[in-house]
Amino acid sequence: MAIYRRKASPIKIGDAIDYKDVELLSNFLTEQGKILPKRLTGLTNKQQNKVTKAIKRARMLSLLPFVNREGSL
């Protein structure tokens, strides 16, 4: 039976996830601007929901693009 080690979360528990922190949020987006799933990011359910809401809020305020056609963030 294989034993899998859980990947460490890139965000520490208790750290604030803010929609204005574009540099942090861009780590959870693909080159096309899509939100990465939690199985790839290593976030918990609660953290993934907060990151998703922060990304969507940043998109509405034009801090992040909805679709990235240039291929770079």
UniProtKB/Swiss-Prot annotation:
Organism: Rhodomonas salina
GO cellular component term of the entry, any: mitochondrial small ribosomal subunit
Species classification: Eukaryota, Cryptophyceae, Pyrenomonadales, Pyrenomonadaceae, Rhodomonas
Listed name of the protein: Small ribosomal subunit protein bS18c
Keywords: Chloroplast, Plastid, Ribonucleoprotein, Ribosomal protein, RNA-binding, rRNA-binding
Subcellular location: Plastid, Chloroplast
Alphabetized NCBIfam families for the sequence: S18
Subunit structure: Part of the 30S ribosomal subunit.
InterPro entries reported in the protein's UniProt record: Ribosomal_bS18, Ribosomal_bS18_CS, Ribosomal_bS18_sf
GO BP term, example: translation
Pfam families found in the cross-reference section: Ribosomal_S18 (PF01084)
Keyword Ribosomal protein: yes
Family: Belongs to the bacterial ribosomal protein bS18 family.
